[in-house]
């Protein structure tokens, strides 16, 4: 019960973590650009859902999350829905189709942005990239890199103009992903060298 209350509190209190940081960029400048139109912004946040989507926790289903977001929108509120990772793995719901159904549910719920957690890599590198491509929302990571190419695998930041402000979400994948997942997934097919890394 303690865990359920904690997650519910995070949802309603619009918390953010270091994995997905919400920053108001240049608030005075934004106010000048949108005089008289600066409003409160609600950020709904989930993480470590681990495919627990059954009715044992009805207030935490994706249908409930979608309804919560819609309730803010229907009230004329500015709202964004974000996830900080570890959502496609954890129960049989995820393993049956390697997270495809979870991504579909997140699409239907109206997520705006997400960052990959260490468990997004549990089905292998190819599936991790494929699952993220199935999302209608962008995934962000400033420190997941392709070593041979010397660039990021995903965008590092997403900007939203909302509530009279410019809001930036910066994605950071936990560096422990490299060891908490399967290191071989970050190597080439011959497992002779690493081609991906999560920089710390």
Annotate each predicted stretch with a short phrase:
Residues 2-15, 19, 31-200:
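Acidic, metal/ion-coordinating pockets
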Residues 24-29:
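C-terminal segment of classical bacterial N-terminal signal peptides
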């Amino acid at each position: 019960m303690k865990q359920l209350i904690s997650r519910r509190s995070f949802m309603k209190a619009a918390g953010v973590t270091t994995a997905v940081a919400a920053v108001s960029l240049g608030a005075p400048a934004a106010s000048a650009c949108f005089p008289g139109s600066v409003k409160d912004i609600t950020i709904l946040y989930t993480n470590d859902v681990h495919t627990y989507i059954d009715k044992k926790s009805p207030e935490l289903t994706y249908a409930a999350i979608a309804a919560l977001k819609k309730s803010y929108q229907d009230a004329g509120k500015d709202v964004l829905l974000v996830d900080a990772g570890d959502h496609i793995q954890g129960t049989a719901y995820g393993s049956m189709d390697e997270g495809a159904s979870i991504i579909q549910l997140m699409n239907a719920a109206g997520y705006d942005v997400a960052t990959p957690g260490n468990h997004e890599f549990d089905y292998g590198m190819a599936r991790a990239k494929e699952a993220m491509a199935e999302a209608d929302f962008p995934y962000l990571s400033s420190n997941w890199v392709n070593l041979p190419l010397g660039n990021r695998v995903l965008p590092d930041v997403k900007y939203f103009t909302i509530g009279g402000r410019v809001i930036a979400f910066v994605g950071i994948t936990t560096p422990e992903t490299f060891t908490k997942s399967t290191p071989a997934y970050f190597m080439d097919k011959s497992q002779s060298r690493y081609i991906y890394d999560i920089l710390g």
